[in-house]
Amino acid sequence: MTLQIGVIGCGAIGQDHIRRLTRTLSGARVVAVNDIDPQQARDAVTKYGLDAEIYGDGHDVVAAADVQALLVTSWGPTHEAFVLDAIAHGKPVFCEKPLAVTADGCMRIVEAEVAHGKRLVQVGFMRPYDEGYRALKRVIDSGEIGAPLMLHCAHRNQSVGERYTTDMAITDTLIHELDVLRWLLGEDYASAQVVYPKKTRHASAHLADPQIVLLETVSGVRIDVEIFVNCQYGYDIQCEVVGENGIAKLPDPPAVGLKHAARQSVEIMTDWKERFIASYDVELQAFIDGVRAGALTGPSAWDGYAAAVAADACVRAQRSAAVEPIAMAERPAFYRG
């Protein structure tokens, strides 16, 4: 069976997913598209040679009889309504982050999915599909380094645009760590604090950069995450887990070591899409395979909710300079195990 997918949102990430659906992945084809800018939708159909219907309203894509599953890559504030509509139609939906722009919105999706009685939602957190993170989790789960005590992490971008704001360091950048570190450790967060080092001269006047986020999990693991989005030298993701008996570190992407002109160097990537390109392929293939098998296994609506609750606390901590509690609702039995 070839899964027939409708895509809502044909901007950069939407077209990137359309590209992989048509040229890289197997078992699916795009049969319907929509974008708030009709020309974007037409361009996607032409660029990728799609035999797909163009709809003026994303909700019409959800309702289309030939659409079996949805891919939501539209503007963030529209995600909640489209995902809820997909659940109401009983159609599986892959939703890029954020699942919703508020934790309350995420909870509405959780409640709708639980009421439906079957998992239909996968959230576009791709780092759990990265082979480096998977290898790191295997080491942690093996017990080789003992119980994790501390994590030292960094999320560095070469630069960001003028429209990037201080809170986006949480909602657009740290959100990936909030998801993947919770997955690595297998436990939720208890509190968050944000501190501000000396500001880089490369940051816009309205942007606090860098920032350090201090997290504590429910078992007492301490996590520090450096967010530095104007680091200049490249795109660099670091994660070191300090355990009772040893240390495990996220491997850097493979690169050729160069010795030349009395120098030794290794190239550092500058594009976040290049760093995790394989992970995007694997996560979307997992969605296709899960829908066809009748059982989704990727990041759930509950994971989207958990990330949103933690992000809200971090944004509060940015403003209060205090340690902010992270209080989640009780996890429904639907999402356990």
Curated annotation (Swiss-Prot):
SUPFAM superfamilies: Glyceraldehyde-3-phosphate dehydrogenase-like, C-terminal domain (SSF55347), NAD(P)-binding Rossmann-fold domains (SSF51735)
Pfam family of the protein (one): GFO_IDH_MocA
A molecular-function term among this protein's GO annotations: nucleotide binding
Entries under InterPro entries matching the protein: Gfo-Idh-MocA_inositol_DH, Gfo/Idh/MocA-like_OxRdtase_C, Gfo/Idh/MocA-like_OxRdtase_N, MI/DCI_dehydrogenase, NAD(P)-bd_dom_sf
Primary enzyme class: oxidoreductase
Enzymatic reactions: myo-inositol + NAD(+) = scyllo-inosose + NADH + H(+)
EC numbers on record: 1.1.1.18
Alphabetical keyword list: NAD, Oxidoreductase
Keyword Oxidoreductase: yes
Subunit architecture: Homotetramer.
Family: Belongs to the Gfo/Idh/MocA family.
Protein name: Inositol 2-dehydrogenase
Organism expressing this protein natively: Burkholderia vietnamiensis (strain G4 / LMG 22486)
